[in-house]
Amino acid sequence: MIVPVRCFSCGKVVGDKWESYLNLLQEDELDEGTALSRLGLKRYCCRRMILTHVDLIEKFLRYNPLEKRD
């Protein structure tokens, strides 16, 4: 859904790195580990926050509960 703002374990801010992470993966064609290292995420707890995030917001935006089905 929404990227967590802080790491659950250590409290470091990780929410501002999500867009940069996606850009590094797509435009620079880096692997996940290298991209996380370039973003300055050294601790495995912080790396976990980015690696395991599932971005579901686009699916929820398409859902309209007021729309009638035929």
From Swiss-Prot:
Cross-link (Glycyl lysine isopeptide (Lys-Gly) (interchain with G-Cter in ubiquitin)): 59
Protein family per UniProt: Belongs to the archaeal Rpo10/eukaryotic RPB10 RNA polymerase subunit family.
GO biological process assignments: nucleolar large rRNA transcription by RNA polymerase I; ribosome biogenesis; RNA-templated transcription; termination of RNA polymerase I transcription; termination of RNA polymerase III transcription; transcription by RNA polymerase I; transcription by RNA polymerase II; transcription by RNA polymerase III
Chief location of this protein within or outside the cell: nucleus
Compartments in which it is found: Nucleus, Nucleolus
Biological role stated in the UniProt entry: DNA-dependent RNA polymerases catalyze the transcription of DNA into RNA using the four ribonucleoside triphosphates as substrates. Common component of RNA polymerases I, II and III which synthesize ribosomal RNA precursors, mRNA precursors and many functional non-coding RNAs, and a small RNAs, such as 5S rRNA and tRNAs, respectively. Pol II is the central component of the basal RNA polymerase II transcription machinery. Pols are composed of mobile elements that move relative to each other. In Pol II, RBP10 is part of the core element with the central large cleft.
PANTHER family in UniProt: DNA-DIRECTED RNA POLYMERASES I, II, AND III SUBUNIT RPABC5, DNA-DIRECTED RNA POLYMERASES I, II, AND III SUBUNIT RPABC5 FAMILY MEMBER
One Pfam family here: RNA_pol_N
Assembly behavior: Component of the RNA polymerase I (Pol I), RNA polymerase II (Pol II) and RNA polymerase III (Pol III) complexes. Component of the RNA polymerase I (Pol I) complex consisting of 14 subunits: RPA135, RPA190, RPC40, RPA14, RPB5, RPO26, RPA43, RPB8, RPA12, RPB10, RPC19, RPC10, RPA49 and RPA34. The complex is composed of a horseshoe-shaped core containing ten subunits (RPA135, RPA190, RPB5, RPO26, RPB8, RPB10, RPC10, RPA12, RPC19 and RPC40) where RPA135 and RPA190 form the DNA-binding cleft.
Binding site for Zn(2+): 7, 10, 45-46
One example GO MF annotation: zinc ion binding
Miscellaneous comment text of the record: Present with 5300 molecules/cell in log phase SD medium.
Organism per entry: Saccharomyces cerevisiae (strain ATCC 204508 / S288c)
InterPro entries linked to this entry: RNA_pol_su_RPB10, RNA_pol_suN_Zn-BS, RPABC5/Rpb10
NCBIfam families registered for this protein in UniProt: PRK04016.1
Keyword terms: DNA-directed RNA polymerase, Isopeptide bond, Metal-binding, Nucleus, Ribosome biogenesis, Transcription, Ubl conjugation, Zinc
HAMAP family for this protein: RNApol_arch_Rpo10
Alphabetized SUPFAM superfamilies for the sequence: RNA polymerase subunit RPB10
Entry's Gene Ontology cellular component terms: nucleoplasm; nucleus; RNA polymerase I complex; RNA polymerase II, core complex; RNA polymerase III complex
Name of the featured protein: DNA-directed RNA polymerases I, II, and III subunit RPABC5
